[in-house]
Structure formats: structure tokens, C-alpha cells
């Protein structure tokens, strides 16, 4: 069974012979997936260091991705002269074609990068965009037309290629809940996502959706409108038992050892137990679980913990499910709660 088929079977609950593994940022030869994204236009020249094609400027102060420090859409008047990037510009999908030319037998994930809501907040500014959702809905819809229009054109081009899934990355949660009211999300964003997911499915591809934070209130919505894979890097925040009870068997989960604590400060035994716990709870005998591995040194993950995570997830392919109870965590040192 090829690596591509193993991932497909896990997503479709069709009897994957082992747990597939996605590597995010290193050790790609060990990954069952390969990722590619659209790139800059070939003729794009930033006006200053860190400027994106969208017109905002990235500020990176540490080893994380950083955040925009300027926002081009300062008000409604700024839309008049704003020119978004051309989704069909020369060179836009060159990297995708390069990856596809030597992808071997792996499952190909085409990523849209930062999408939808997050992209809109980068253009307008986070606080201003949230205020506009309540005070100037027409302006919000115009911004979203720009963002989703660009993405829809990129999707149209990507799904004509032999990719297996389109990946959306929109962080919707805080530690406590959704950034906006769930009903507002359903009114403004759900229909736009539904259209995009239908576009992907109509081309015979899978929908892979990443979101950080406590997004529990919209999980059923995402499943209802067509998400095939839900990628969560903080499964403890959502509650693994609860995820399994309410959504197990309905969607494939791609999860990491919880990045907020376990992956960073867990012992070897804790990491191994948690990997098995994720597999046993979120997966089924036919699939439904994909392991996610990322080197998160920027958050304090040691090389030792990274290697333990690798060993733990790869060891799942040698064992049968045991319905492991949730493994306890060692107490945090005083002052780190």
C-alpha cells in the first residue's frame, strides 16, 4: 500500500494499514504527505523588507512567524485605490509544479497559506475588522470578497493538478472559545467556506482544515459543510474524550502531541502514552486519525522531546489499540501554571 493510499484510507475510514504521519517542518523523508503552496508573482518586488503582495508588512521579533505591523485597508476610502494580488500571475504555482514533478508515492497537500478570516484581519487590522463585523458589515463583505475571490481562483488552478487535498488554515479560537459569536460566524463565514469546500470536492479532492484555539462550537458546522480532515495542535484544549464522543468516526483528525504543554514539557513516558491515547480515542479500526509532527523549538520544545514524539507516533504502527486512558501530566513547576 502506497503512502498516498494509506492517507486516503485513513481519511475515508477505509482500512488504513497503519497510522499515517504528517511532518510539518523537517524530516520530510519520513512523512506520508508532501506539502506545497502557491507562491509570489514572478515579477513582485517588495517596496520594503517584509512587505507581502497584499500590502502589509511582516514584523518578526523571534523565531515564530511574526505578525503584520501595517494594514493597507485603513478605512472604506482605501478600497478605492487598493489593488490585490493577481491570483493568475506568472509564477504563482511554479513551486506546486516543482513538488508535483518529484512527489514519489506520497499524499499531496496543497496549502492556501493563511486564509479567510486571518487574511482579512491582516488587511484591515484585527481590532478594526472585529469592530467592522458589527458596525460596517458592507465593508467587511467587500474585504472578504477580495480575500475569498483570490483564494477561489487559486483553488480553481490547484485542483486541476494532481494534488490530493486543499489545506485551509484559519485560526478561529482563543483559549476560551471562538473569537466571534458562533451565530455571527455561521452568518458571515460558513457560506463562504461551504462554497470553497464544494469547489474542492467537485474536483475530487479532500478538504483539510487547520484551526488553533478553542473552536468547539463550530466543529459540527465544519463537518456539515464538507471538512474531511480537522487539524488540531492543541487537542487538550478541546478535550480529546469529548472530541471522540461527539465526532469520532464523522471526520478524520490530524493531531499533534498537545503543543501547549505535553509536547514541550512532557516526559518520554507521558509523550508515548499520549500518542497512543490520541490514536485510540480519535481513530477507529478503519482509520480516522493522522499523526502530526512539528519541531516547535520556538515554543521551547527540546530536540529530545521532538525525537520522543517521532518515536511515539511511529511506534503506533507496531501496536494494536488498547483504549488507553488519558495519561496524567507531571505537575508544572511553581510559577508556570
What are these regions (language model features)?
Residues 1-26, 83-328:
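Active-site loop segments of alpha/beta catalytic cores
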Residues 29-96, 103-106:
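Helix-coil boundary/capping segments in enzymes
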Residues 335-337:
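Glycine-biased, low-complexity coil/linker segments
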Amino acid at each position: 500500500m502506497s503512502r498516498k493510499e494509506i492517507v486516503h484510507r485513513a481519511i475515508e475510514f477505509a482500512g488504513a494499514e497503519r497510522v499515517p504521519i504528517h511532518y510539518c517542518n523537517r524530516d520530510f523523508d519520513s512523512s506520508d504527505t508532501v506539502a506545497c503552496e502557491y507562491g509570489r508573482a514572478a515579477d513582485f518586488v517588495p517596496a520594503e523588507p517584509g512587505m507581502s503582495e497584499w500590502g502589509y508588512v511582516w514584523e518578526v521579533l523571534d523565531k515564530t512567524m511574526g505578525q503584520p505591523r501595517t494594514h493597507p485597508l485603513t478605512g472604506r476610502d482605501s478600497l478605492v485605490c487598493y489593488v490585490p494580488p493577481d491570483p493568475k500571475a506568472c509564477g504563482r504555482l511554479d513551486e506546486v509544479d516543482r513538488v508535483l514533478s518529484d512527489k514519489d508515492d506520497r499524499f499531496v497537500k496543497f496549502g492556501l497559506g493563511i486564509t479567510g478570516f486571518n487574511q482579512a484581519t491582516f488587511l484591515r487590522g484585527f481590532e478594526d475588522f472585529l469592530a467592522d463585523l458589527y458596525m460596517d458589515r458592507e465593508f467587511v463583505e467587500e474585504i472578504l470578497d477580495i480575500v475569498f475571490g483570490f483564494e477561489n481562483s487559486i483553488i480553481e488552478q490547484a485542483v486541476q493538478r494532481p494534488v490530493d487535498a486543499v489545506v485551509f488554515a484559519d485560526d478561529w479560537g482563543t483559549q476560551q472559545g471562538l473569537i466571534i459569536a458562533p451565530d455571527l460566524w455561521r452568518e458571515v463565514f460558513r457560506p463562504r467556506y461551504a462554497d470553497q469546500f464544494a469547489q474542492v470536492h467537485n474536483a475530487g479532492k479532500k478538504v483539510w482544515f487547520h484551526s488553533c484555539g478553542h473552536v468547539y462550537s463550530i466543529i459540527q458546522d465544519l463537518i456539515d459543510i464538507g471538512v474531511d480532515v480537522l487539524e488540531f495542535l492543541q487537542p487538550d484544549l478541546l478535550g480529546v474524550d469529548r472530541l471522540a464522543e461527539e465526532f469520532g468516526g464523522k471526520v478524520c483528525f490530524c493531531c499533534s502531541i498537545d503543543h501547549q504543554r505535553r509536547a514541550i514539557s512532557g516526559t518520554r513516558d507521558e509523550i508515548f502514552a499520549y500518542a497512543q491515547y490520541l490514536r485510540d480515542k480519535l481513530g477507529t479500526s478503519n482509520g480516522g486519525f493522522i499523526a502530526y509532527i512539528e519541531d516547535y523549538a520556538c515554543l521551547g520544545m527540546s530536540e529530545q522531546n521532538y525525537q520522543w514524539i517521532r518515536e511515539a507516533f511511529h511506534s503506533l504502527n507496531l501496536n494494536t489499540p488498547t483504549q488507553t486512558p488519558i495519561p496524567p501530566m507531571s505537575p508544572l513547576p511553581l510559577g508556570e501554571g
